[in-house]
Amino acid sequence: MKKILFVAVLAVASLAVYAQPRAIGGRLGYGIEFSYEHGFGESNMLSIDAGVPTLFINNDFAGEAVVTYDWINPFGADFSKVWSHKGEWNWYLGVGAGAGFHTWHLKAADTYLGWDDHIFVGVAGRVGVEYNFWFPLQLSVDWRPLIGPQFYNFRDTDGVSHPSPHENKVDFNTNGLYMGGVSLAVRYKF
């Protein structure tokens, strides 16, 4: 009797796990990111992405994390007949929030001028297309802008090139329109 009860509990638990699909992988675009998705039913998912948005160009160092809640919609029946022989095509749209930092060493010719530090927060959006293969692999292409205020500080290291050794400013993060930009994601579904 205990064995039957154990098997029944295990079967119910496995159905509950299967009903909440997850995917883990990476996104590659303007930067590189770790990506995790957790499904809520068949039409919603929570996406968590964290990584470096700039690929370390010109002595850069950066980090960013974004969480979005996405609504998933299948493509129409006509599209599915032609392009979905074994897999499944979906499009999705979502909103969320994100934050990050960006630091780079400013240089003119061979002289280091100082450090420029940015911290940004904002509202994130996401729109994309995904293909779920008949085996546990997912490919997607999406655009995920992150817009909001950014706070930055210039630190003069040579004491000559800038009138004030520290300059603090606040403005709108226009880089967020392309830094989260169009990305290709590859994820393992489990």
Each language-model region and where it sits:
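A periodicity- and composition-biased signal for non-globular, repetitive helical segments
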Residues: 8-9, 150
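Outer-membrane beta-barrel transmembrane domain signature
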Residues: 67-190
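Hydrophobic h-region of N-terminal signal peptides that target proteins for export
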Residues: 10-18
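Short glycine/proline- and aromatic-enriched beta-strand/turn motifs that initiate or cap beta-hairpins
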Residues: 17-70, 104, 183, 187-190
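Repeated loop/turn-to-beta-strand initiation elements of outer-membrane beta-barrel proteins
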Residues: 5, 22, 43-48, 74-79, ...
